[in-house]
């Protein structure tokens, strides 16, 4: 049988080597923290229904895991965002899309999952939304 999780995801073979790694998003010049926060929260809530941590003062957002079930596997994904202070007084954020995979037979308990170095295609839009709604560089 085809590896559905592999086919439904992107990895370094497609130049998307972002799973389980922090990458930076720098906000457009002049963007306020308020606007950035609203846009980040919007991306988090739209793509991951359950936001577990939303601490505006600390500039930290963390979603709950979202499970995606395939015939033989379960992939779970979550988003974490932390404000990052750069020397140039630029507003930027560290973003991590965590991805883990389990055999469906094992179930959904934490010990069934291991890190998965691919991001499900349905979360590709999260990466582009971060770029377009906040800033440019990665």
Language model regions located:
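Ser/Thr-rich, low-complexity intrinsically disordered terminal regions
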Residues: 1-138
């Amino acid at each position: 049988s085809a590896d559905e999780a592999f086919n439904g995801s992107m990895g370094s073979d497609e130049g998307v080597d972002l799973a389980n790694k922090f990458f930076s998003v720098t906000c457009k010049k002049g963007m306020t923290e308020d606007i950035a926060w609203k846009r980040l929260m919007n991306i988090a809530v739209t793509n991951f229904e359950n936001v577990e941590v939303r601490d505006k003062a600390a500039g930290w957002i963390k979603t709950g895991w979202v499970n995606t079930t395939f015939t033989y596997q379960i992939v779970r994904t979550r988003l974490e965002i932390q404000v990052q202070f750069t020397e140039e007084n630029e507003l930027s954020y560290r973003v991590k899309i965590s991805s883990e995979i389990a055999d469906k037979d094992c179930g959904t308990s934490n010990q069934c999952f291991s890190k998965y170095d691919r991001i499900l295609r349905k979360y590709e839009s999260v990466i582009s939304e971060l770029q377009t709604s906040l800033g440019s560089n990665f």
